[in-house]
Amino acid sequence: MSKVSNSGGDSKNTLYCSFCGKSQHEVRKLIAGPTVFICDECVELCMDIIREENKSSMVKSREGVPTPQEIMAVLDDYVIGQKDAKRVLSVAVHNHYKRLAHQSKSSDIELAKSNILLVGPTGCGKTYLAQTLARIIDVPFTMADATTLTEAGYVGEDVENIILKLLQAADYNVERAQRGIVYIDEVDKISRKSDNPSITRDVSGEGVQQALLKIMEGTVASVPPQGGRKHPQQEFLQVDTTNILFICGGAFAGLDKIISARGEKTSIGFGATVRSVDERRIGDVFRELEPEDLLKFGLIPEFVGRLPVIATLEDLDVDALVQILTEPKNALVKQYQRLFDMESVELSFHDDALRAIANKAVERKTGARGLRSIMEKILLDTMFELPTLEGVQEVVISGDVVDGSARPLYIYAERQDEKGNVSA
């Protein structure tokens, strides 16, 4: 029960939170129930607990192992296109669950894991696929950036820090961490800097690949709970990485040229055949990817051998980018409409405006990542003016606005502002 007291000569009753015991003067808000009170801080704490519970899993089947179709159905809600890559990831995660379930049964056959390499041009959804995957599975999941890794003993992060992040995601439960999934982003940035091995020490390239070999294949890693270099005297945790699934992703800029050059016999002199530049899209070229191309790019054979499943992603065309703008649950257009809704203003886009935005992103060759910067530039002036304008009911964006030849149309509650149509 909440406490009520008469302090000194004050005739007013002081109310207290029934959960934490703080008085009404110590908190911003005290909410009254039939016989109890709760403060705003306790409400926030309860919401955090509920959010953590909801994060545990979004997909589960009757047997506790989500089917590939169930995983892909959730990925489809957030990620547009990339059907092949989503199928590969869905099957890999499903098999990961099955392998963990199989471990508890006595069997002569040991199921080995199949680590995955995602290859695709920038802005096609590699990292976003991994982030979405993290939300829908109920095993510990962590993402690591390969560009920050260095060989042991040099300034930078050790590869053991990846396992430390997985441990943190599992709340330092070693058993759960040993069943987790790790996504290593920007793995193309640790390619060998020279075709000739070991001329000089390559601590952020080949050295990192070699350091990753054992933890990707399976070893007992000694992980410092607080980071190894700042606290050398701490006790190490032993984590077996045999059952941790590793997914690596990278843009591999220039790999398409290596693939195109493979198999083409070049000749010189007057009888040489003139070959046109490969005009196919990068995603189409990546479909012909072979492990030998990755070796020429700078990955060492042992590293490629530990990534048996290779999934290639396509570069996004105009139609796919328009879908990305409008269809996913957290689509960019929906995000900006929510921002404008906070100002009690409706934001709408003409179809030609969406296609013009998508065309600009294709020209910049930045994929879906470039859509936000284009939208920000288009809506910047409007977002600057809107809070000080009164009576605006709707803002309409046309194709001319995207091209820069017109200003957004402001529709007021009682009249239309013709000024919005005047050419800039």
Swiss-Prot record:
Keywords: ATP-binding, Chaperone, Metal-binding, Nucleotide-binding, Zinc. GO terms for biological process: cell division; proteolysis involved in protein catabolic process. Gene3D superfamilies: 1.10.8.60, ClpX chaperone, C4-type zinc finger domain (6.20.220.10), P-loop containing nucleotide triphosphate hydrolases (3.40.50.300). It holds the Pfam family zf-C4_ClpX. Residues 5-58 form the ClpX-type ZB domain. Zn(2+) binds at residues 17, 20, 39, 42. ATP binds at residues 121-128. It comes from the Bacteria. GO terms for molecular function: ATP binding; ATP hydrolysis activity; ATP-dependent protein folding chaperone; protein dimerization activity; unfolded protein binding; zinc ion binding. Transmembrane segments: none annotated. InterPro entries: AAA+_ATPase (IPR003593), ATP-dep_Clp_protease_ClpX (IPR050052), ATPase_AAA_core (IPR003959), Clp_ATPase_C (IPR019489), Clp_protease_ATP-bd_su_ClpX (IPR004487), ClpX_bact (IPR046425), P-loop_NTPase (IPR027417), Znf_CppX_C4 (IPR010603). One of its GO terms (cellular component) is HslUV protease complex. Belongs to the ClpX chaperone family. NCBIfam families: clpX, PRK05342.1. HAMAP family: ClpX. Component of the ClpX-ClpP complex. Forms a hexameric ring that, in the presence of ATP, binds to fourteen ClpP subunits assembled into a disk-like structure with a central cavity, resembling the structure of eukaryotic proteasomes. ATP-dependent specificity component of the Clp protease. It directs the protease to specific substrates. Can perform chaperone functions in the absence of ClpP. This is ATP-dependent Clp protease ATP-binding subunit ClpX. The gene is clpX.
